A protein has these predicted regions:
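Low-complexity, glycine/proline-biased repetitive segments and flexible coils/loops
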Residues: 2-291
Length: 291
């Protein structure tokens, strides 16, 4: 019986892997998915690591109203959750879903739209929250409004995937919104009319970005899943490294960078807030397994 088991195992041969865009370094192969797909493994089971990044939330849209009098500043979008997988074993067809970013908001006072989840087989990264729209992979930034002197805290991030958004701030004459959380840091809270910056994304997988050409390259370091910036009656704030975009007061905010999971920046009176960035899945495995 043991001899038969050895023979059966040897007939499987080394894993044969398909799917995604293939790149490599001296030690590893990387398969990158920027859209839904399948990681195919035939032969022996494959041992792999992976990062799964969900779609980021869009920034909120503000409004100034004369009757009744209010000035709403909604927050920056939270980054999509970044789920890291290590020493996984897989065979057959493993389904991959790459989440979309939340849609931009246009006109009126509106919280940002949540992104959508990304997944690899049964492993799911949680979508980023829209600005002032609560919890997510990373939380959205909080709201500030005057003359009501009302503000909200930032949304909570998902443990192990992201961070909290920053709080909004308000008095009877100023208001500002918080930055969305990022995979590497919490969003900054707003202070006295100044919007909070989006939280920084994660640079833990910078070497993966260098090989695959993904993430945001900042002076040679690659970041994923940065939060969107907030706005304020005095000033707006920057987005976080990792595809998050800045908040703006009187113009349209830019969309977060595609396939980073970044959060979109908020706007006060521009035509649209920044849409969230779509997600990403990268699978890495050793060359010695397959060559």
């Amino acid at each position: 019986m043991p001899i038969l088991g050895i023979l059966a195992s040897s007939k499987l041969g080394k894993p044969v892997v398909t799917g995604g865009t293939l790149t490599s370094d001296a030690t590893y192969y990387y398969r990158t998915f920027t859209a839904n797909g399948t990681l195919g493994v035939t032969g022996s089971a494959l041992t792999y690591d992976a990062i799964v990044i969900a779609g980021g939330g869009s920034g909120g849209h503000g409004e100034a109203s004369a009757s009744p009098v209010f000035n709403d500043y909604n927050g920056g979008g939270g980054a999509g959750g970044l789920l890291a997988l290590t020493s996984q074993s897989g065979s057959g067809n493993l389904s991959i879903v790459v989440g979309a970013g939340g849609a931009a908001r246009t006109g009126g006072s509106a919280v940002g739209a949540n992104g959508t989840n990304s997944s690899l087989a049964a492993n799911t990264a949680t979508a980023g929250a829209g600005g002032s729209n609560g919890a997510g992979g990373s939380g959205g930034g909080g709201l500030g409004t005057y003359p009501d002197n009302f503000s909200t805290s930032g949304g909570a991030g998902t443990a192990g995937q992201g961070n909290n958004g920053g709080a909004g701030a308000a008095t009877t004459s100023t208001a500002s919104s918080g930055g969305g959380g990022g995979a590497g840091a919490v969003g900054s809270s707003a202070v006295t009319g100044n919007g909070g910056a989006g939280g920084a994304g994660s640079s833990t997988y910078s070497s993966w970005g260098s090989v695959t050409g993904t993430g945001q390259n900042v002076s040679g370091t690659y970041y994923y899943a940065g939060g969107g910036g907030g706005t304020g009656s005095s000033s707006a704030a920057a987005g976080g490294n990792g595809g998050g975009t800045a908040g703006v007061n009187t113009s349209s905010a830019s969309s977060a960078t595609a396939n980073t999971g970044g959060g979109g920046g908020s706007t006060f009176s521009g035509s649209s807030s920044g849409a969230g960035g779509s997600g990403l899945v990268i699978v890495r495995y050793t060359k010695v397994q397959v060559d």
